[in-house]
Curated annotation (Swiss-Prot):
It is found in: Plastid, Chloroplast thylakoid membrane. It is a single-pass membrane protein. Component of the cytochrome b6-f complex, which mediates electron transfer between photosystem II (PSII) and photosystem I (PSI), cyclic electron flow around PSI, and state transitions. Belongs to the PetM family. One of its GO terms (cellular component) is chloroplast thylakoid membrane. This is Cytochrome b6-f complex subunit 7. The 4 large subunits of the cytochrome b6-f complex are cytochrome b6, subunit IV (17 kDa polypeptide, PetD), cytochrome f and the Rieske protein, while the 4 small subunits are PetG, PetL, PetM and PetN. The complex functions as a dimer. It comes from Cyanidioschyzon merolae (strain NIES-3377 / 10D). Keywords: Chloroplast, Electron transport, Membrane, Photosynthesis, Plastid, Thylakoid, Transmembrane, Transmembrane helix, Transport. One of its GO terms (biological process) is photosynthesis. Its main location: plastid. The keyword Transmembrane helix applies. The chain crosses the membrane at residues 4-24.
Length: 32
């Protein structure tokens, strides 16, 4: 049960980090 809860918490965090990095790269490219 703990593994399921961990996945439910970690997966959204990984998605948020991925989106954040993607937007950051796009922003840096536009600023350059």
């Amino acid at each position: 049960m703990n593994e399921i809860v961990a996945l439910m918490i970690i997966c959204p965090l990984m998605v948020m980090v991925g989106l954040g990095m993607g937007f950051a790269l796009l922003w840096l490219q536009q600023q350059a």
